[in-house]
Design a protein with these regions (language model features):
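Alpha-helical support elements that line or immediately flank enzyme active sites
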Residues: 47-71, 164, 170
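Asp/Glu-centered strand-loop micro-motifs enriched in Gly/Pro and often flanked by an aromatic residue
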Residues: 35-49
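A contiguous, well-ordered beta/alpha segment that forms the leading edge of an enzyme domain
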Residues: 42, 70-97
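Blade/loop signatures of beta-propeller domains
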Residues: 19-31
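Basic/aromatic DNA-contact patch characteristic of tyrosine site-specific recombinases
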Residues: 13-14
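Catalytic-loop motifs flanking and including active-site residues across diverse enzymes
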Residues: 49-50, 54-58, 80, 99, ...
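Predominantly the structural core of cysteine protease catalytic domains
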Residues: 2-5, 10, 31-33, 39, ...
Length: 256
């Protein structure tokens, strides 16, 4: 039987306090025509049959930040991030998804330790890690997080962030065509026909590069798509009904 996927990411509610990563903050000279940050990341993970896409997207961003700081290629504890995020959103004891704002806040409040300290075991999806693990997590706290505005400028903002070396975690509305055999085989995502296709729900992924399209890391294992990755058109990211939310994390201030 085909693997069952969960689509229960929640859209961020409006919060005027969000620090925005707009055009001015991400001003660049001549950005490269293409960027590919996959070599700084471990093999694509598989979230399994729980709705932990938000934690997988956040862990990819954390892994890249650690690599940038000279820490090598690591796997952050996806389970720890999934649990702390849901704990703070009041949904630890159910699998009802989470928001990306809650994810970045948990990354800043608790940190995300290496997966060697708290492996990805979904039987522990509804319990907090022991205090010793949470104490170690504090060494890996995100110091900054910024929201990328959705809308027509989003594809360019994604590219500017990626050109500056920041992976972008994002939440999107997905439709039937995303689960098609064609996408699973080749990793090329079409624009959905929202008038005729069924809405699957919300899903978090991470943009890790671009050329003509944006290169996206999923969390359905390396057998799906292009080694676990897919390519999505700019039009998807420019549509605020499809792209819900987008964030970057950093260990330092971005811009001035």
């Amino acid at each position: 039987m085909p693997e069952s996927h969960v689509f229960n990411l929640k859209r961020d509610p409006v919060d005027r306090r969000d620090l925005m990563l707009g055009i001015g903050r991400m001003a660049v000279g001549t950005r490269p025509k293409s960027v590919d940050l996959r070599s700084a990341l471990p093999a694509v993970w598989n979230q399994g049959d729980v709705g932990s896409c938000f934690a997988h997207a956040g862990a990819a961003c954390q892994a890249h930040q650690v690599f940038k700081e000279g820490g090598g290629i690591i796997t952050p504890s996806r389970l720890c991030l999934a649990v702390t995020t849901r704990h703070d959103e009041g949904t630890l004891h159910c699998d009802n998804g989470a928001t990306l704002r809650g994810t970045v806040k948990a990354m800043a409040r608790y940190g995300v330790p290496p997966e060697t300290l708290w492996p990805y075991d979904v039987s522990k999806y509804f319990e907090l890690p022991p205090p010793a693990v949470l104490a170690q997590a504090e060494k890996w706290q995100a110091l900054r997080y910024y929201r990328i505005p959705v809308g027509r400028h989003a594809p360019e903002l994604f590219r500017r962030a990626l050109a500056a070396g920041f992976i972008v975690m994002f939440g999107a509305a997905l439709y039937d065509s995303f689960e098609s055999e064609e996408v699973a085989a080749a990793g090329r995502v079409p624009m959905p026909n929202t008038a005729t296709e069924a809405l699957l729900g919300g899903h978090a992924m991470a943009a890790v590069g671009y050329d003509a399209d944006l290169l996206v890391r999923n969390s359905w294992g390396p057998e799906w798509g292009e080694g676990g990755y897919c390519r999505m058109p700019d039009a998807y990211f420019a549509d605020p009904d499809l792209l819900w939310d987008a964030w970057v994390i950093s260990l330092t201030e971005i811009g001035k």
